[in-house]
């Protein structure tokens, strides 16, 4: 379904409810620049470097796009998805079933989730929705539950520290969304709904959190304007 949720002024803060879940795939493909290309980059990289029967857990898996792509690349992977939205998981499970894929899903708040050890954790556009006081604690848990040589892939919308640059990048991003078919009204309405829900950090703040969690080898593998993907390795 086409995302037309914000053709009217929002009556509440943004949440991943049934209305969002029903249009999520269209929404994210039109709202996150190079979403599919970045998803495929990360998936192909993991398929190339991970050992047989590696375990991958997608934290904030939404409609399971990444897990489904990964499952079709490597049949041996053990795949898990966690999300706090029952509506999103309903879509994820339905899609996985349609593809005949064996993916385990958990409905949970990530800050309260009973983590298990994995080779890879993925958090694509997830941390930005976690309340700031809880983010470091969550990253600490992720690091602790990674196997030796484990990997974290983390994609985030980011802030620029320079105010002039930040203003212009934000305007370019709005231009991008207009080119994807969103009106100025829709863009402003969604921004209003996301206020104090999606709270981005700067690149430096994200790197500092990763380092504080224990990661020593961290690289940026994708960036477009105010969107960036980090890969971090556990020693």
Swiss-Prot record:
SUPFAM superfamilies cross-referenced by the UniProt entry: S-adenosyl-L-methionine-dependent methyltransferases (SSF53335)
Name of this chain's protein: Carboxy-S-adenosyl-L-methionine synthase
Family note: Belongs to the class I-like SAM-binding methyltransferase superfamily. Cx-SAM synthase family.
One of the protein's GO biological processes: tRNA wobble uridine modification
Gene coding for it: cmoA
InterPro entries per the UniProt record, alphabetical: CmoA, Methyltransf_25, SAM-dependent_MTases_sf
Binding-site residues, S-adenosyl-L-methionine: 35, 60-62, 83-84, 124, 191
Reactions catalysed: prephenate + S-adenosyl-L-methionine = carboxy-S-adenosyl-L-methionine + 3-phenylpyruvate + H2O
One matching Pfam family: Methyltransf_25
Taxonomic classification: Bacteria, Pseudomonadati, Campylobacterota, Epsilonproteobacteria, Campylobacterales
